[in-house]
Amino acid sequence: MNVTILAANLRVKADMPVEIAATVDGETLQVALEWALIERWLGQLANDAGAVRNAIHQRRQAIERVIQSRVYAHGVPISGEMTLGLRDLGGRM
């Protein structure tokens, strides 16, 4: 299974999930990263779009592995949407 995070503009707004796009074997998914996760990673820098982009880039492999695991376990969501949070990535600093 091939999972890739796609480059895109990020919209960063406090208390709102940060949405990224990913492909899973050619199918596009919208992946929402919960705000609590972004805050855990970045603390006070969470409102800085550049810092968020860098944090996602640094954790790209971990994010792709979690997406892959979720798809293996449950299949590609019919809605084309997935949410990842502290439970999924909180320990992957």
Regions found by a protein language model. Name each.
Residues 44-93:
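Acidic, low-complexity intrinsically disordered segments
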